[in-house]
Design a protein with these regions (language model features):
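Positively charged, polar, low-complexity stretches
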Residues: 1-89
Length: 89
């Protein structure tokens, strides 16, 4: 299983977050750098994958409410795609 631990320090703004996610999650070149596109890409993952999300992502002042929305998208995608696991630590 591929395990990816997200680094909150790399998520300094919404554009930086999407750039980081594109790299960290090896998202396709057509990734649209928004939460809808992220959901689409995550539900298409075919390799067993675990994403470890820092627990304080929802309290991050640089991301604001977007951190909460990101976590929700990750969790929703994991519900849809049985080989994707999202763990909050």
């Amino acid at each position: 299983m591929r395990t990816i631990t997200l680094d909150l320090e790399r998520m300094t703004s919404v554009p930086a977050l999407h750039k980081y996610l594109r790299s960290a999650l090896a998202l396709p070149v057509y990734y649209g750098a928004n939460l809808d596109a992220l959901y689409d890409c995550l539900t298409e993952i075919v390799e067993p994958t675990q994403i470890i999300v820092p627990a304080d992502i929802t309290d991050n002042e640089k991301l604001g409410r977007y951190g909460e929305q990101l976590l929700q998208v990750l969790q929703d995608a994991a519900e849809e795609n049985e080989i994707l696991q999202v763990t909050v630590k």
